[in-house]
Amino acid sequence: MSLRSLFVAGLATLALAVPAPQIQARQGMSSNELESGPCRDVTFIFARGSTEQGNMGLIVGPGVCSSLKKDLGSDKVACQGVGGAYTAQLAPNFLSQNTNQASINAATDMFDLANTKCPNTKIVAGGYSQGSAVIDNTIQALGSDLKAKVKGVVLFGFTRNVADKGQIPGYPKDQTKIYCAVGDMVCVNTLIITPAHLTYGADAGDAAKFLASKVQE
């Protein structure tokens, strides 16, 4: 069986293991507070994992958003998912950047919007699974001025963990926190999906506290 077949089969198997209410909840997890709302002190940009619906997904993105609002104040944080050309399809995982350029461009648009619409906002970001590669590649390519406005990044099930040596190249390591669960094969340079890859919701609160600490420095 090919690696791609294992990846697809793994996702299918895990989907069957997800309780029905959770599957139903996946249908509408979106947040567009940067695009549609007022400027806030902090802007959280998140890229979901492959096959997740909405622009925030379900596994971890919404949890980090809600925890960050709890820690800093709901009126202080704008949460924005990466949508548009980032459709979270499976195939881009097999490309050299573990995602495609269109997805990276979609995320870049959100960072650019935060910078131009809300020049005083502090930007934090996160990504899960393929979304971790989207955010990783996006931040690497940001101009120095905009990159300096990104105060913290959290990555879950980091598909480029080995390739990028546990960090985002060209971005401060102390402003990055990577979550790789024991048994998550995605973090060790494979695309084999195991149950551990679905556990990152448990890390949402810790990730939010990390991001909150960075915007308060």
Swiss-Prot record:
The record marks 50, 130 as: Transition state stabilizer. GO terms for molecular function: carboxylesterase activity; cutinase activity; lipase activity. The active site is at 129 (nucleophile), 184, 197 (proton donor/acceptor). Keywords: Disulfide bond, Hydrolase, Secreted, Serine esterase, Signal. It is an enzyme of class 3 (hydrolase). GO terms for cellular component: extracellular region. One of its GO terms (biological process) is lipid catabolic process. InterPro entries: AB_hydrolase_fold, Cutinase/axe, CUTINASE_1, Cutinase_monf. Disulfide bonds join 39-118, 65-79, 180-187. PANTHER family: CUTINASE 1-RELATED, CUTINASE 2-RELATED. Belongs to the cutinase family. This is Probable cutinase 3.
